[in-house]
Amino acid sequence: LDRGVPFEIDMEGRPLVGDTLRSALTLAGEGGPLTIALQAYLNRTSNDLAACADAGVSVRLVKGAYHGDIGDFIAIQEKFRTHAETLISSAAPFCAATHDPVLIDWLKGKMQAHKNLIEFAFLKGLADGTKTEMAAAGWKVAEYVPYGPADPAYILRRERYLTTLGHLGRSPVP
């Protein structure tokens, strides 16, 4: 952090959230650009957003890929919107990481005049057309590249999400 290199902390399952957030807040006290992923489907996220704002920690808002406090797809979308509204009203830059076309379109509508305050993040290999189209339209776009020994579990969570979308008659952005 002392060299000014941006540092991002991903979020894992619910049992690790408290310790992960405490670590991020401790690191934030040492300075340097720090971002942490916060999950919309956890009841604690409103408080975590406030703690991050107080500490100057940037947020990458995700819906969540583990078992959270909220399991209903539509309810998670609503929580995502609520948390995004909090981030938007803060006027601090943030990242939205979702492949949900409903949420992406909603955010684009909300942020059209403030493109500099939002970055959209997508998983490598998904939404390539959307990434290219959004970048060409002036949106900040990032690609998340997962790595590490937990590939099978990671892939399983993404497959479960895509299956859920299919059952709802939806699909991720192209």
Residue locations for each model-derived region?
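Positively charged, amphipathic and often flexible ligand-engagement surfaces
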Residues: 1-174
